[in-house]
């Protein structure tokens, strides 16, 4: 089973996680929303799969390029 790391495209804080561990997702689905410079930026899945785990919690500060979730295909 292949795993896919989902990385944040911007630094900021995790405003809301919109999916759950174990949930099946499609490419283009929003996994979470990052607040950066008073803007809400969605983290979008580039591949379909199942959410294995989140590497961050809501309200956590994150950096650009940080792994925020792991998917399995």
Residue ranges and their predicted role:
Residues 1-13, 30-46, 73:
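Short beta-strand-turn/beta-hairpin segments enriched in glycine/proline and small hydrophobics
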Residues 16-20, 24, 53-56:
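Short histidine-centered loop motifs in beta-beta connectors
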Residues 22-31, 59-68:
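A structural signal for short beta-strand/turn segments enriched in small hydrophobics and glycine
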Residues 45, 56-59:
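Juxtamembrane helix-loop transition sites at the ends of transmembrane segments
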């Amino acid at each position: 089973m292949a795993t896919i790391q989902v990385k944040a495209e911007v630094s900021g804080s995790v405003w809301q996680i919109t999916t759950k561990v174990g949930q099946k997702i499609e490419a283009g689905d929003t996994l979470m929303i990052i607040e950066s410079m008073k803007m809400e930026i969605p983290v979008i899945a580039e591949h379909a799969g199942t959410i294995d785990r989140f590497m961050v919690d809501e309200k956590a500060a994150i950096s650009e390029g940080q792994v925020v979730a792991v998917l399995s295909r």
